[in-house]
Amino acid sequence: MNAVGIEVSKGKSMVAIMRPFGEIVSAPFEIKHTAGDIHSLVELINSVEGESRIVMEHTGRYYEVLAHQLSKANLFVSAINPKLIKDFDNDSLRKVKSDKADAVKIARYALDKWQNLKQYNVMDELRNQLKTMNRQFGFYMKHKTAMKNNLIGILDQTYPGVNTYFDSPARSDGSQKWVDFASTYWHVDCVRKMSLNAFIDHYQNWCKRKKYNFSQSKAEEIYGKAKELVPVLPKDAITKLIIKQAVYQLNSASTTVESLRTLMNETASKLPEYPVVMAMKGVGTSLGSQLMAEIGDVSRFTHKSAITAFAGVDPGVNESGSYEQKSVPTSKRGSSDLRKTLFQVMDVLIKTHPQDDPVYQFLDKKRAQGKPYYVYMTAGANKFLRIYYGRVKEYLSSLPES
């Protein structure tokens, strides 16, 4: 029974090997994340008599190299939430923070939780890919929003309000009607310098070329508004270049977002719980894949309260003696990305109001009681996660073992 504790950092790690009752098999030593050092570590672990289990914190992306390579060497590897390691065995007044001390602490954690350690496996790699894509998706969504606001800010000086003319959703290639329109009619003079009939013909040809729906009443409305607008920047080559560059940057970010959205759905469809998640109300191919990316493997949660605590939407408790606080904020100690996705799901439910859905019924009930927005949204997210946990776990248990 050998516990291998690994304190992972960027490019290198500290390793300690222990046995029960504090027996030190190998004092903490450093290895580089190179093929040679990892091979030497595998040989050392295999040379130690008895069963060995390796535990490391899943800190950022640093641990993945070791977890992957050690798993390929047929060793038992378990990646643990750093919060669990931090809170483990804090029974000393001394505060020691070093890689060597942390490696020993992780090894002691492995010994204490020996029977409950979950092995890192190939499915975890697929989920890690999905989670990485989701984080990239979030990054590019923020970038897209910044580029969109930048373009609108410039257009307010050449064609105010043009971004409000169309509300069509983005296409699969990331293009949007208002952006394409602003790219062609980048200045208000591009519209009002033409006659009404000339603009209608030009706009109709543009819609046909770009494969958008044409409406004559919309064309007349656009032309009428253009007559009243007052631009700030002149209609010249410099202004056109500024706008074209802003449009290009927005289209580039939007294309990346949509390609990631498609790839995430394709990856999520390989997970066993995909059909169950897609069948839930408020969830589509985009939010569904984001949920699966952030929640991960449901089987690692022992009960419903564990998954709500992981998301940070579990109700807080503040009691001491005879004092008991009635309204306590949620813990918010879990994944902020998961909470964001859950709030988006709740928003979809409120907008679509499926009357037969228990989560929507719960949300509607809390709203009718006059609960504040964040209270009923968080409560709905909590209920949704509990239902998610129950349905997915029941479905996974019904599948034949592979």
What spans do the regions from the language model cover?
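A detector of single, family-specific signature residues
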Residues: M1-S402
